């Protein structure tokens, strides 16, 4: 894990925080970069100390278990999602909807959805939405976030396609957010990073297994397997 002061923190409305009445939701694409990295995805903080919510995940067998918590109180929603299904296309959708009028919160991740009713919510909410490190929350997992949209009476769309700096603008170019220690993924599209390598004295081939997210490299007497989720390499000799 990286040092605490080097971990990413993204405050969505750092420069201009809107106020929502009756309803708002946020949705974004998320990708996991490690099946061994767990932690907090984001926090949503209201003006009232009792109205702070966070989204946490860890791994339970073949599932990713997401938990929406009301800080200092309880787990509101526990939502298991198939790890294989969610990670099949790299990105999967996450949506959290706050119905302020009906006092209920809905969590939808990939193709799974749950509703928690009876959550006392203010009819008007000025949310401080923070991804990653936030106050005492320092367990920042290895994830990526893309295409963030906050829906209310007005829709705020953040492509998150910046290439450098700490400023985050909406799709119209208006400054709203600030991010500390960002890693902008657009740069990785141009600057490739070597993950590993294989060599063989005899003729060799390779193929990719999409279901297992593995690359196979083989020659006449050996098979090497590189797992793209864990980075582990295993080898097997043919007999």
Protein language model features and the residues they cover:
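Short, aromatic/His-centered strand-loop micro-motif at the edge of beta-sheets
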Residues: 68-93
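Short tryptophan-centered beta-strand motifs in secreted/extracellular beta-sheet-rich domains
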Residues: 89-100, 105-107
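Short coil/turn segments that connect the beta-strands within blades of beta-propeller domains
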Residues: 211-213
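A carbohydrate-recognition surface predominantly in extracellular/luminal proteins
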Residues: 9-44, 52-55, 148
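Extracytoplasmic low-complexity segments
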Residues: 1-15, 147-193
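Repeated scaffold domains used in trafficking and secretory/extracellular systems
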Residues: 199-208, 239
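Flexible glycan-contacting loops in extracellular carbohydrate-active proteins
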Residues: 116-144
């Amino acid at each position: 894990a990286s040092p605490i002061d080097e971990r990413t923190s993204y405050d969505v409305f750092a420069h201009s925080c809107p106020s929502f009445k009756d309803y708002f939701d946020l949705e974004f694409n998320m990708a996991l970069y490690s099946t061994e990295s767990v932690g907090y995805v984001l926090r949503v903080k209201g003006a009232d100390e009792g109205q702070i919510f966070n989204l946490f995940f860890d791994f339970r067998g073949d599932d990713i278990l997401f938990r929406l918590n009301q800080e200092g109180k309880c787990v509101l929603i526990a939502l298991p999602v198939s790890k294989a299904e969610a990670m099949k296309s790299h990105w999967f959708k996450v949506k959290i909807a706050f119905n302020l009028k009906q006092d209920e919160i809905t969590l939808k991740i990939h193709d799974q959805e749950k509703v928690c009713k009876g959550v006392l919510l203010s009819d008007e909410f000025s949310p401080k939405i923070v991804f990653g490190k936030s106050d005492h929350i320092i367990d920042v997992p290895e994830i990526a976030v893309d295409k963030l949209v906050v829906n209310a009476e007005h829709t705020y769309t953040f492509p998150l396609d910046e290439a450098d700096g700490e400023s985050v603008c909406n799709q119209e170019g208006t400054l709203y957010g600030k991010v500390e220690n960002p890693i902008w993924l657009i740069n990785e599209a141009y600057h490739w990073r070597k993950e590993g390598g294989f060599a063989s004295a005899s003729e060799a081939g390779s193929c990719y297994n999409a279901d297992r997210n593995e690359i196979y490299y083989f020659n006449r007497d050996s098979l090497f397997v590189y797992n793209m989720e864990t980075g582990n390499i295993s080898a097997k000799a043919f007999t």
